[in-house]
UniProtKB/Swiss-Prot annotation:
Region listing for NADH dehydrogenase I subunit D, in residue ranges: 216-602
Coiled coil: none
Any Gene Ontology CC annotation: plasma membrane
EC number: 7.1.1.-
Pfam families assigned: Complex1_30kDa (PF00329), Complex1_49kDa (PF00346)
Protein name: NADH-quinone oxidoreductase subunit C/D
UniProt source species: Klebsiella pneumoniae subsp. pneumoniae (strain ATCC 700721 / MGH 78578)
Catalytic activity entry: a quinone + NADH + 5 H(+)(in) = a quinol + NAD(+) + 4 H(+)(out)
Amino acid sequence: MVNNMTDLTAHDAAPAWQTRDHLDDPVIGELRNRFGPDAFTVQPTRTGVPVVWVKREQLLEVGDFLKKLPKPYVMLFDLHGMDERLRTHRDGLPAADFSVFYHLISIDRNRDIMLKVALSENDLHLPTFTKLFPNANWYERETWEMFGITFDGHPNLRRIMMPPTWEGHPLRKDYPARATEFDPFELTKAKQDLEMEALTFKPEEWGMKRGTDNEDFMFLNLGPNHPSAHGAFRIILQLDGEEIVDCVPDIGYHHRGAEKMGERQSWHSYIPYTDRIEYLGGCVNEMPYVLAVEKLAGITVPDRVNVIRVMLSELFRINSHLLYISTFIQDVGAMTPVFFAFTDRQKIYDLVEAITGFRMHPAWFRIGGVAHDLPRGWDRLLREFLEWMPKRLDSYEKAALRNTILKGRSVGVAAYTAKEALEWGTTGAGLRATGIDFDVRKWRPYSGYENFDFEVPTGGGVSDCYTRVMLKVEELRQSLRILQQCLDNMPEGPFKADHPLTTPPPKERTLQHIETLITHFLQVSWGPVMPANESFQMIEATKGINSYYLTSDGSTMSYRTRVRTPSFAHLQQIPSAIRGSLVSDLIVYLGSIDFVMSDVDR
């Protein structure tokens, strides 16, 4: 097991919502020693990480410097943009019509840094970051598509979420957010022919060769409608016989504009949309969003709220892992475990429905708390589940996961090292299978996870299909361990914080104070007004690290909602891990990733 967690210094113990510039972070001193004390603008935020504005001409040099430090920043966690043109609260920041941010992580330091570059509307060009971090490829494609920012030197700067004939850049502020703002859609014969022509497969457009001097390659479309694609997902395979010479994932079929929706919903009314980004995760998806909003608001929730949130999150983690393990076994060729798993998942849904009133998409977490208190009898239902589930896990292992055929199909298949995982932004079980025990619940505890006793399972140095699935089984056991502690140690107290921005606010006082009634009316009708600032929250979601990066301009709605999902990064890694393997190995690999396309496409 690798444990590189550094002890958090005293200044890290400040409230999560405190606005800080992080000038005392060692990396700021290292950057100033190398590039000069006046080379950067350091932005105070509530993100919890240093935010440094760099000049475009210095971007690659700064990125290379950070990657080669003694304790390097080895992972490009996220990269995206923002339309700054309508933003009013920008005091002290470089003039910008648009900006692009680069979020880097250092495993050795257990610290992050966010680089930002300011751009003017008449010169939207940046050098590509792909030479430093290969996973910048898809992030730059999406940023170009959404904002029109060109990354010079990018190997294949083409649309990634939208159809190839799409016009405009959807995340610009002057781009319509609702269908009613567009002209009526008409599909003429000429337009239909144009659309069909645009969908014609041309290997050169995907960076693929038609063949060698002596033979042509065969091209095969796996998906977008294929049972092993786990959603509307297409992979173009370049084959030499059954060997995969190269492949290109084609995503975007599930894209529904989740980040654009964040700009048109109030801080409160956006919560149901978070459930649908990774639709198996339920309340897990709500956690990073409400925590990020609470940082903006300066809310500290009661202990009871923290434990309730952890309990619901771990129930949904078990629910998601059960589906993953059983469908992985099904992809390899065994059917029975799927039916076993759905029996177990039904028990979880019954428990979740009893607590929240809903099954898959509860939309139950609230800014400052949860929707309502735990119902009578919740402890009995949870206790019965905890008595049932451990024996079922043992049966999964005995019946399927120790099977020699399954192991023969998955051991050593689609294997990658820790270095490769970090280069591609891999998180979750895929990264931990390489031996790095990076679990946000342990390394950067949130919602009181530091008060729970549990282990982080890791692999032995190489992440392959079998190791990934076995880690998930052990993670199930650890989640059961956490749930037992929730059952035994549920605190008493309120289920909402006593704070003016808690939403919806407590209604009891509205019958006594006219000021409270006015506040309640405004928050329920328009939504709460969050202070102008930026906040960020990452969590250990069911499939890896999920995060929300929110920008408030002092309004009832988010100015910019950036959703970073683990599945997006994991699918980009597919070609590097599967080249030289067989098509049958690809099916096993896809089953071992643990993804749903809504988590990829948002």
